[in-house]
Amino acid sequence: MALQWTTLGLHEALIASELNLEGKIQLHDGMEPNISVQLAEFGDLPVQITVSGAQLMVSSALWEASQVKDLARFNELALKLNPVNALSNIGLITLAPGRDLYIMFGELSASSDLAHVIEEIRVLADNTIEAAEAFADQLISRVTSNSGVQS
């Protein structure tokens, strides 16, 4: 059986890796520890990594739902994009009552080798930037999201 990552183990492996993931890598402790990677090659885009059981989730914030002109239209476009952009999906999480945040996310097995984890991080970052550019006309104004992606 392959090694199954823990958040701490993955954090240490990312720091020690020779696979050249350029950026700031931080471990955030708490009820559900996660790793934050600020990717220099993608304009310091922050990407979050969470290991939970057999699953590893990589995500990056897009923008708050309040920044979207027409939520129904945007949701339809996002759902149509997901099958075409199979490695990353757009989701919606609640930050607080009345505050929803669109995210780009991808998942893989917590048993994936480090090269695949790093590839997922890079692909997700690239897809986040592409989504920000593709959906710019769906936003109320040009905003800088929590992820630092300007649309």
Language-model features, listed with the residues they occupy:
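Charge-rich, low-complexity N-terminal segments
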Residues: 1-50, 87-88, 93
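Beta-strand-connecting loop/turn residues
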Residues: 31, 54, 98-100
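Residue-level signature for short turns and capping positions that connect secondary-structure elements
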Residues: 40-42, 63, 109
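A short acidic-to-branched-hydrophobic micro-motif
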Residues: 46-64
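Short, internal acidic amphipathic alpha-helical interface segments
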Residues: 59-100
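Ampiphathic alpha-helical segments that act as solvent-exposed interaction surfaces
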Residues: 73-86, 107-139
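Short, aliphatic-rich beta-strand segments
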Residues: 101-106
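Short, highly charged C-terminal tails/helix-capping segments
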Residues: 136-151
